[in-house]
Swiss-Prot record:
One of its GO terms (cellular component) is cytoplasm. Belongs to the NDK family. Keywords: ATP-binding, Cytoplasm, Kinase, Magnesium, Metal-binding, Nucleotide metabolism, Nucleotide-binding, Phosphoprotein, Transferase. It comes from the Bacteria. It comes from Burkholderia multivorans (strain ATCC 17616 / 249). PROSITE patterns: NDPK (PS00469), NDPK_LIKE (PS51374). InterPro entries: NDK-like_dom (IPR034907), NDK-like_dom_sf (IPR036850), Nucleoside_diP_kinase (IPR001564), Nucleoside_diP_kinase_AS (IPR023005). ATP binds at residues 11, 59, 87, 93, 104, 114. PANTHER family: NUCLEOSIDE DIPHOSPHATE KINASE (PTHR46161), NUCLEOSIDE DIPHOSPHATE KINASE DDB_G0292928-RELATED (PTHR46161:SF3). CDD domains: NDPk_I (cd04413). One of its GO terms (molecular function) is ATP binding. This is Nucleoside diphosphate kinase. The gene is ndk.
Amino acid sequence: MAIERTLSIIKPDAVAKNVIGQIYSRFEGAGLKIVAARMAHLSRADAEKFYAVHAARPFFKDLVDFMISGPVMIQVLEGEGAILKNRDLMGATDPKKAEKGTIRADFADSIDANAVHGSDAPETAAVEIAFFFPEMNVYSR
């Protein structure tokens, strides 16, 4: 499997629960390296731009409102098969359907307040990483 990078966001609900460290431990325990990280409180414009792919969907406004409701922790993860590995760690979008031991099963409250975001493919990972991190701010270790 190839070394990949993926974007991960710890959403406002999980940041408010003070579980950033527990989530980071899961990333690292799965062999993923955190090669860039920053905390931010997204503006409405940034959240709308980042989630523009969902603009026509009925949940778009609620998603944007949620993502600007508090600070988020944004990180780039790197490792063998990082995209799929992170998605496995996150679990199903709906925490009620997520397997026990996944981030969403353990820390999410609802399908809307679902604790984390992760890129779903190499192409989207590249776009999402570039959105938050200029190349000079991502460091392989």
